[in-house]
Amino acid sequence: MSLMNLPEESRPREKLLALGPKSLTDAELLAIFLRTGIKGMNAIELADKLLKEFGSLRKLLGSNENEFCSHKGLGTAKFAQLQAVVEMTERYLFEKIEKEDALTSPEHTKRYLTRILRDRHREAFYVLFLDNQHRVLKGEVLFEGTIDAAAVYPREVVKRSIDYNAAAIILAHNHPSGVAEPSQADRRITKRISDAVELVDIRVLDHFVIGDGEIVSFAERGWI
């Protein structure tokens, strides 16, 4: 059935305008992005099918071009649109933490870091550089690979912190396994970085480990 044949209150776009985006299901939100369906399926039916094939909305959003375009109804134009949406989301979240104290707005910081790191297939070590009022100056992936393989160099963190004239930093990295519990290697590298930056009067305020649906804070554990 075409979306135009549905009652107006059941059409995703009209429903969003009347009740707000939170009233929509994942399939309805995706249908608005897709705009059209394929032969034999309207946009909602196609969206529902795609969500089942990918496993979740998050996995769809985190898919690469080959994965995305291998599904019927999706192509390079839609992939480009999706990447634009994802990038706008990341910039929006970064703007929110950039204008606020990263410590007094920890949920915004966690949301941003989760968005940046959660769906990466390799470990990535990310640093937020803060001024003396704990406002964000810059965020950057400094290292990629396995943290346990000594891929994180404290001297590089010190160098970048000085480059940005940072007074404090927040560390973060992901666990592709999905388990956010910090390892002993995570704790060792945190101490090494903390000791290194303290020599130039810079503080590590926290280290977040991002898993699948969970995030662990070293500061909340009392480890920093």
From Swiss-Prot:
Residue span(s) of domain MPN: 102-224
Chain location of the short sequence motif JAMM motif per the record: 173-186
Residues noted as binding Zn(2+) in the record, renumbered to the chain: H173, H175, D186
Xref: InterPro entries: MPN, RadC_JAB, RuvA_2-like, UPF0758, UPF0758_CS, UPF0758_N
PROSITE patterns: MPN (PS50249), UPF0758 (PS01302)
Keyword Hydrolase: yes
PANTHER family linked to this entry: DNA REPAIR PROTEIN RADC, UPF0758 PROTEIN YEES-RELATED
Family note: Belongs to the UPF0758 family.
NCBIfam families: PRK00024.1 (NF000642), radc (TIGR00608)
Protein name: UPF0758 protein VSAL_I0192
Organism from which the protein derives: Aliivibrio salmonicida (strain LFI1238) (Vibrio salmonicida (strain LFI1238))
